[in-house]
């Protein structure tokens, strides 16, 4: 399903942003 793929992409994108935030914070 396209919806599931989109959600997985968004999840990966958010995870990437969180990792970047952690790098900047510490």
Swiss-Prot record:
It is found in: Plastid, Chloroplast. GO terms for cellular component: chloroplast. Keywords: Chloroplast, Plastid. The keyword Plastid applies. This is Uncharacterized 3.2 kDa protein in rpoC2-rps2 intergenic region. It comes from Trieres chinensis.
């Amino acid at each position: 399903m396209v919806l599931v793929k989109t959600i997985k992409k968004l999840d990966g994108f958010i995870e990437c942003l969180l990792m970047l935030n952690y790098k900047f914070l510490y």
